[in-house]
């Protein structure tokens, strides 16, 4: 089993979803917890286009009304980290992914700084 954590941005997005969408997303999150970085299409895919991140991925699922995507990566602590989620239905694909990746890069940068601070504080406490 892989550890999974999430950003405040992801958590806020998830709370806006209807029950059908929440179930669809949780289905993929449970697969991610089980398979970790080995989870592949059609459940997960690599996100290309980031100049900063080589290991950015997306969880993929859809309902009758929504095409759901959750950006995630494996952080420096080797945990799956859910970054943000969006509904792709009716969106321009290039713009959708450009915005998703840009937002993900900002969240990753902040998250990695927090992890580094935690490591420093832990080492200072020894």
Residue ranges of each PLM-predicted region?
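Basic, Lys/Arg-enriched alpha-helical interface segments
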Residues: 1-67, 76-80, 87-126
């Amino acid at each position: 089993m892989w550890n999974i954590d999430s950003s405040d941005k992801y958590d806020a997005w998830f709370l806006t979803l209807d029950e059908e969408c929440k179930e669809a997303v949780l289905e993929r999150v449970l697969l991610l917890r089980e398979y970790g970085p080995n989870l592949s299409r059609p459940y997960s895919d690599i996100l290309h286009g980031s100049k900063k991140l080589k290991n950015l991925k997306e969880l993929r699922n859809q309902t009758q009304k929504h095409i759901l995507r959750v950006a995630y990566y494996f952080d420096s602590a080797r945990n799956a980290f859910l970054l943000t989620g969006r509904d792709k239905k009716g969106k321009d694909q290039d713009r959708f992914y450009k915005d998703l990746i840009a937002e993900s890069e900002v969240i990753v940068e902040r998250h990695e700084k927090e992890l580094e601070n935690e490591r420093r504080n832990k080492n200072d406490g020894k």
